[in-house]
Amino acid sequence: AVTKMCVFLADNYPILDRDLLVTAAIFHDIGKVTELSDFPMNDYTDEGQLLGHIFMGAELIGNKIRQISGFPPVLATELRHCILAHHGELEYGSPKKPAIAEAMALNFADNTDAKLETMTEIYDKANPTTEWLGFNRFVDSNIRQSTGSVAKRK
């Protein structure tokens, strides 16, 4: 969903470098490959606990880029910045806040995806006859099922 949202944003906002944004969207969580242990355990590795997927992803991408002869250095920095800034805020784990439009767009798409996935999980667990579902810390709101969402699930 994150990549699809980024394609939409790139198609609607000409200031965005589509290639950079879509590449960043595809690879923004690549660090989770080494942050988490193999399936079915999916526990955090020691490196994952100590460094986190954001830093690990930027490092992995940086290492791969260095293997590509002639890769533009500024583009390499911008791609790594998008990965480092994709959580948007320092308190959400990003070592950097978005400083370029593509990093900001990626953050919006990733944040929207995470919050709507949370809402989906809350709705899926809820009784369709219960309107108010309580406060959720992640979305920072008291959650209510919309009539349309209940109708879709009947």
Identify the residue ranges that each predicted region occupies.
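Short, surface-exposed polybasic-aromatic patches that bind anionic ligands, especially phosphate groups
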Residues: 2
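C-terminal membrane module of polytopic membrane proteins
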Residues: 113, 138, 143-144
